[in-house]
Structures are given as structure tokens and as C-alpha cells.
Amino acid sequence: MELTAKFVSALLAAAVVGILPAKAEGDAAAGKKVFNKCMACHDAKTDKNKVGPSLMTVVGRTAGSLESFQDKYSDAMKAAGAGGLVWDEANIAAYLKDPKGKVPGNKMAFPGLKDDADIANVIAYLKADPKP
């Protein structure tokens, strides 16, 4: 009987885990507000570069590959892209959390976002492919 109860409990736990998302999706509207911290150096609404490259359509892009920014990327960022770094959600999250740790030697002065919810929200904003 005790074995059956444990089995049923395990099944219920597995069902609940299967229903709940592994990681909460971010909120694009909240991400737009967080992205204000990035706007001094980056644009996400147009393909215009600023001090940093445009982040419009960054999700899925190979690191250091934006043609219009080639002469400004650090050697480290170009090497990261040549080594296969693609800006998927996981890599963007790691970079936003610790830019110098993810791509040592990159030029970005921003120290990173510490709040995981802010990171998820910025990624949701970038995935939404914001337009003016």
C-alpha cells in the first residue's frame, strides 16, 4: 500500500512539473522599460547602430556578425561568433547577466542585469522584434 501511495505521489508530481513551464516567459512590455537602460548605446526598433550594434533581429544572429557594425566589434566578439556563438535565449541571458564573463574582452561597458526577471523581460522584448 505504501509503495502505491509513493507511486501515485510521484505521478502527480510529474504531472504538475509537466504542466508548469520550466522557466517563466518574459513580458515584452516590461522588457521595453528595462531596455531603457540599454538605449544609450543600442537601438532595437531600427537597424541603426549607436555606440553598440542595433539589436533589431538579434535573436538568432551569430555574435559579431552584423555587417554594418563589423569595423566596431571587438576582436573577442568576432571570435565568439566565429566559434559558433549564436544569440539564442540562453546565450543572451548569460550575456545580459555577465557580459564580461560570457565574452571576455568585449567592449560593452554595461556591467549586466542582475535580476533574472528583468533579463527574461528584455529577451521577450527583443524577440517581439520591436518596431517604431
List where the protein language model places each region.
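Bacterial N-terminal signal peptides that target proteins for export
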Residues: 1-10
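Bacterial N-terminal signal peptides
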Residues: 9-18
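Sec/Tat signal peptide C-region and signal peptidase I cleavage site
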Residues: 19-25
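Conserved Rossmann-like nucleotide-binding pocket used by diverse enzymes
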Residues: 20, 34, 109
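Sequence/structural segment immediately N-terminal to covalent heme-attachment motifs in c-type
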Residues: 25-50, 55
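Electron-transfer interface patches adjacent to heme c in soluble/periplasmic c-type cytochromes
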Residues: 44-46, 57-90, 110-120
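Short acidic/histidine-centered micro-motifs embedded in hydrophobic/aromatic stretches
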Residues: 54, 58, 125
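C-terminal capping alpha-helices of c-type cytochrome domains
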Residues: 86-132
